[in-house]
């Protein structure tokens, strides 16, 4: 029997959908404190994004420790408990393969904050006003 071909659009939608499901599962596990770790119990952790590899075997999980406290410590605790998270995700999703999770700090908030600071700078504001009056 021939293998069914999927279009790139279908594949990308599936990656997004599975990534979002993984994000919800991990968020729920952390919110309910189902992992028994003192560091994770003491911190509020937000799972901001999950990016799946095209074969769904690897998931990069971006997290943000709320209030920016001890993010390195939280990442270390998450990495220590990776096996627990992988097992829970595999049991709840029932995919062909259990995705290997890789936890990283989400730095997009820091980048956005820097951009906002730059845009609030008086010199930049002046340049923006000059461009509007020229256009």
Swiss-Prot record:
Gene: rbfA
Compartment(s): Cytoplasm
The keyword Cytoplasm is assigned to this record: yes
Oligomeric and partner information: Monomer. Binds 30S ribosomal subunits, but not 50S ribosomal subunits or 70S ribosomes.
UniProt KW keywords: Cytoplasm, Ribosome biogenesis
Species lineage: Bacteria, Pseudomonadati, Pseudomonadota, Alphaproteobacteria, Sphingomonadales
Xref: PANTHER family: RIBOSOME-BINDING FACTOR A, CHLOROPLASTIC-RELATED (PTHR33515:SF1)
Function, in words: One of several proteins that assist in the late maturation steps of the functional core of the 30S ribosomal subunit. Associates with free 30S ribosomal subunits (but not with 30S subunits that are part of 70S ribosomes or polysomes). Required for efficient processing of 16S rRNA. May interact with the 5'-terminal helix region of 16S rRNA.
Residue ranges crossing the lipid bilayer per the database entry: none
Location (main, coarse): cytoplasm
Pfam entry (one): RBFA
Cellular component, GO annotation: cytosol
Family listed: Belongs to the RbfA family.
SUPFAM superfamilies: Ribosome-binding factor A, RbfA
GO biological processes: maturation of SSU-rRNA
Keyword Lipid biosynthesis included in the entry's annotation: no
UniProt-recorded Gene Ontology molecular function terms: ribosomal small subunit binding
Name by which UniProt lists this protein: Ribosome-binding factor A
């Amino acid at each position: 029997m021939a293998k069914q071909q999927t279009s790139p659009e279908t594949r990308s939608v599936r990656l997004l959908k599975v990534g979002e499901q993984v994000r919800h599962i991990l968020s729920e596990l952390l919110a309910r404190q189902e992992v028994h770790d003192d560091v994770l119990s003491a911190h509020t952790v937000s799972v901001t994004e999950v990016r799946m590899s095209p074969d769904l075997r690897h998931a990069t999980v971006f997290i943000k420790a709320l209030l920016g406290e001890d993010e390195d410590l939280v990442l270390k605790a998450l990495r220590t408990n990776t096996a627990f998270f992988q097992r829970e995700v595999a049991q709840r999703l029932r995919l062909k393969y259990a995705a290997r999770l890789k936890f990283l700090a989400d730095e997009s908030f820091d980048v956005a904050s820097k951009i906002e600071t730059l845009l609030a700078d008086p010199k930049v504001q002046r340049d923006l006003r000059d461009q509007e009056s020229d256009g």
